């Protein structure tokens, strides 16, 4: 398989919806039972529209875009910045592009820039994944 080129777009991938049940499952698995994630009344009391998804849950969903991009890719690192709360019920979509490709002796190192967008197209999270490709 040929190496990707900088600027190459990744196909958009659905990352949600992130409903209350998914948020509750994540809270149990992670041990993060902050009421802002689990109790709509608490979230509204601090000015949010509803309970919100955990940032790491959003990050995990966004990482699917990098992990599913090429079967031969090995993830070296993944960073994420959260730009807005993600209320329960949000339907996120991930998209991205190849930002950089470096040739190595045994393959290529690729940096992907990734975005998680809500149904209105607003960016909820921005990620950067570094992947290693063989050959």
Predicted feature residues:
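Catalytic strand-loop segment that frames the active site of acyl-thioester-processing enzymes
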Residues: 1-51
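A generic structural signal for short beta-strands and their flanking turns/coil linkers
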Residues: 14, 22, 32-34, 74-78, ...
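Hydrophobic beta-strand-centered segment that forms part of the acyl-chain substrate-binding groove
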Residues: 44-53, 57-98
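HotDog/MaoC-like acyl-thioester-processing domains
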Residues: 1-12, 85-135
């Amino acid at each position: 398989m040929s190496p990707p080129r900088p600027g190459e777009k990744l196909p958009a991938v659905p990352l949600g919806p992130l409903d209350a049940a998914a948020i509750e499952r994540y809270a149990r698995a992670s041990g993060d039972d902050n009421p802002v994630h689990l109790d709509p009344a608490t979230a509204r009391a601090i000015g949010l529209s509803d309970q919100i998804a955990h940032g790491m849950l959003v990050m995990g969903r966004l990482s699917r875009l990098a992990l599913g991009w090429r079967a031969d890719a090995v993830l070296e690192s993944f960073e994420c910045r959260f730009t807005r709360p993600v209320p329960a019920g949000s339907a996120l979509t991930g998209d991205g592009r190849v930002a950089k490709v470096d040739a190595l002796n045994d393959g290529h190192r690729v940096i992907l820039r990734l975005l998680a967008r809500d149904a209105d197209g607003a960016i909820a999270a921005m990620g950067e994944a570094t992947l290693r490709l063989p050959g």
